[in-house]
């Protein structure tokens, strides 16, 4: 049943306007369609940020304990939908079954870890030293709206990891998944909403690079969490630096293709095993 299920990824608050519909095919069989991606229009991006900004103060006031409960509820729902996630990780992202299992485990771990951090850092004030006998308290709060952009090689774990951190801290999130793997992201966002996280607080904005450019250049964005190429991260950094508005946070995880060095002491069978794993594990990464 899951092998033939057709999935859809679309903006959280989709308008009635026509937009591009892109097929999402299996990376190992480009004739097999897994689902479709409905791209986010420019004005829908602007509206999404407006909604996220409007609800952020209330989400922040909710407090760390209540936000933690919602993140834990999302983790529970992720586990209840294990079959859906494992199927999508294999069909949409081309992962092996073992990689799909590890991906889901990491996503659940992220949700539970940041739930604990919400309790630890955002539930009660931190008592600071009072050199002259005064009482000093430090309360941590969210900064505003965060844009989260994730890659295709970890379409669930990284997609949910940075939004979970932002949500735990009292920020709201507009999230753009990789254009190749939006279906996994759409399921993750839907389950977060079912867990009780407001739709305005965590919004999905599928699409190509143009969507990413908009959510990293808007002056209302308080921060960007990006995983991808170093070149793109540098472009985002320049965009944030050149815009009018408060200084934004940039969290960038970037990298490249590593080499494999084999010396004369290596066992041939070990080299073969490791080369095969590097070629096919983690969606070919």
Task: Specify the residue positions occupied by each region the protein language model found.
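Extended, amphipathic, non-transmembrane alpha-helical segments
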Residues: 79-85
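Hydrophobic packing residues within well-ordered alpha-helices of enzyme cores
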Residues: 111, 185-188, 215, 236-237
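ALDH superfamily catalytic-core signature
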Residues: 194-197, 217-219, 223, 230-285
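Short beta->alpha connector loops at strand-helix junctions that form conserved
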Residues: 176-178, 206, 263-264
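Structural signal for hydrophobic
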Residues: 146, 170, 202, 221-224, ...
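Terminal low-complexity tails and localization/encapsulation signals of metabolic enzymes
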Residues: 1-50, 54-57, 61-76, 87, ...
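Conserved small-residue-rich beta-alpha loop and adjacent elements
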Residues: 124-199, 269
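A structured beta-alpha segment of the ubiquitous adenosine-cofactor-binding alpha/beta core
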Residues: 135-137, 203-225
């Amino acid at each position: 049943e899951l092998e033939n299920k057709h999935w859809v990824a679309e903006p959280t608050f989709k308008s009635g306007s026509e937009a591009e519909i892109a097929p999402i095919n299996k990376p190992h069989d480009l004739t097999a369609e897994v689902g479709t991606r409905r791209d986010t229009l420019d004005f829908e991006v602007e509206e999404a940020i407006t909604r996220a900004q409007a609800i952020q103060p209330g989400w922040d006031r909710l407090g760390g304990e209540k936000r933690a409960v919602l993140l834990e509820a999302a983790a529970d729902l992720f586990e209840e939908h294990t079959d859906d996630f494992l199927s999508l990780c294999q069909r949409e992202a081309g992962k092996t079954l073992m990689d799909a299992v590890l991906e889901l485990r990491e996503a659940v771990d992220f949700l539970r870890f940041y739930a604990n951090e919400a309790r630890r850092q955002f539930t009660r004030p931190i008592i600071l030293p009072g050199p002259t006998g005064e009482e000093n308290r430090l309360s941590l709060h969210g900064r505003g709206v965060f844009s989260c952009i994730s890659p295709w090689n970890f379409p669930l774990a990284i997609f949910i990891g940075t939004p979970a951190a932002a949500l735990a801290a009292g920020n709201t999130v507009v999230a753009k998944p990789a254009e190749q793997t939006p279906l996994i992201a759409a399921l993750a966002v839907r389950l977060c909403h079912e867990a009780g996280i407001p739709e305005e607080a965590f919004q999905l904005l599928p699409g190509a690079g143009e969507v990413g450019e908009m959510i990293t250049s808007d002056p209302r964005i308080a921060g960007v969490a990006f995983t991808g190429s170093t070149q793109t991260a540098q472009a985002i950094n320049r965009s944030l630096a050149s815009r009018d508005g408060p200084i934004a946070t940039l969290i960038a995880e970037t990298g490249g293709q590593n080499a494999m060095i084999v010396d004369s002491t290596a066992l041939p069978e070990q080299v073969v095993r490791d080369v095969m794993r590097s070629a096919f594990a983690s969606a070919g990464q």
